[in-house]
């Protein structure tokens, strides 16, 4: 069905084709808001550049083809940088159904065996890395959907190396702990997402992620072999240990009883925590190490996904037609897709039709049929 080959990126009707992929990626690099991003805009770009530098020729050929990258290593890095931030800016569902995919709330007193229980229904970062990388490796993908799958893998591997994306002290991964510091951050999680990475960049260069990436590659070059891909659960556990030791314990934050599904926002410290110069210097070093590991491991994962170069039959051509969107006026008789989780429905060209996770979709023949089952139209569907 033609609709399955379409991937909507924006809140309008932006339909990705090979002809406009580069424009989409360029706009993502220039206009993306920093505050919304895990690891921050620059953190994800650093991971992507390191990974691009360490891909095998076989893996690089597939990545370049899927992302429509410009020629050369620099073009590949630019495309991966831009793709790395899309899951935070353009692939969000209207009802935020994908929000839980970016982290796993492991309690500070959890054991390694508790990981499965912290990922209900496979809706967490570890499960999604496994799911999307497997789909890419299976090879039975439509090239248009592969763009989204690859962007998610690039992004999620970065996320899982941010320590507070794999830890919670009944505080939503540090989101409930205000900070007292010279850096611009409202809470501990935000401090680790962006300002700490920016400090790291300015300590190396004038705030350029590409330069920072190359510096980190050299600094941790001896660890590159050791940082081959390991199961996502193992990485989550490793990041959790970093959070325990270098964030919570270092700041003398008490350990709260395990409450991973808590709706309330608790500050276990009972006060704003001070991030002084000594702590920030230590945090810069830890963040740099985590970003380097993420980049090396992302490259290792993609090298495992694609061990053979892309074949000519798999190479997209500029003449490949892009499917035309179905007009909203035809929605009453077109395909209606509902989100089981949010009970919202949409149709091609409106709402979150092409952003709904495949395993979360239900198809209805008409709008009336959807509404009879208790579904409501997405806000921007007329």
Region locations from a protein language model:
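Bulky hydrophobic/aromatic "packing anchor" residues in well-ordered structure
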Residues: 27, 103, 345-346
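Mature, structured domains enriched in cysteine- and short glycine motifs
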Residues: 315-382
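N-terminal, motif-rich segments that launch catalysis or mediate targeting to/interaction with membranes
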Residues: 37-156, 163-292, 296-314
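N-terminal signal peptide c-region/cleavage motif recognized by signal peptidases
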Residues: 33-35
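Short stretches within intrinsically disordered, low-complexity N-terminal or propeptide regions
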Residues: 4-5, 30, 320
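Acidic, Ala/Val/Gly-enriched low-complexity intrinsically disordered segments
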Residues: 2-4, 13
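Sec-dependent signal peptide recognition
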Residues: 18-25
